Amino acid sequence: TYMHFKHNSHTNKWKSNKVRYVYTTFSFRKQPELKMEDYLDGVRKNFIEAVKKRVENCERPIACLLSGGLDSSLVTSIVSKLSKKRIETFSIGLKGSEDLKYAKIVADFLGTNHTEIVISEEEFFERIPEVIKVIESYDTTTVRASVGNYLVAEYISQNSNAKVIINGDGSDELMGGYLYFSAAPDSM
């Protein structure tokens, strides 16, 4: 069994020994030039609409994961404004963490019912084998990012009625927010 990629196509050969060629082409409509303010307004409106779509008409208790960073703070702010009830927010980190500090500032400003989950380095490392089993990955970056999410999800499931959990994931990928993206070529 193998997969081989060619220019504009790929070939699959599976156990049946049949070869299938798939050709993919993309066409993009030319968009009119807009002012920077129009682009920013479009991002703002679509961002709010994406959160609204997940919050409006939601019958279940909502909570937000709040790191204190820009992405989760913006999402939490929108959820808080759209929600009919005071929302819960949760943060997780090591004692003295900057994330916990800034998450508390945002939570206080928004008036959320905020919970800080403070973990030790030992607890973090102890849980890695369990997380690897659950996420079915040994990828270092994935595991590192998943341990905190796993622990905060476990805490919420045991200590909260929240059934819908919203976070800021995806914004960095969409907007090129990771530090290593700054070294990427301009064409990205």
Label every PLM stretch briefly.
Residues 26-188:
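ATP-dependent adenylate-handling active sites, centered on carboxylate activation for C-N bond formation
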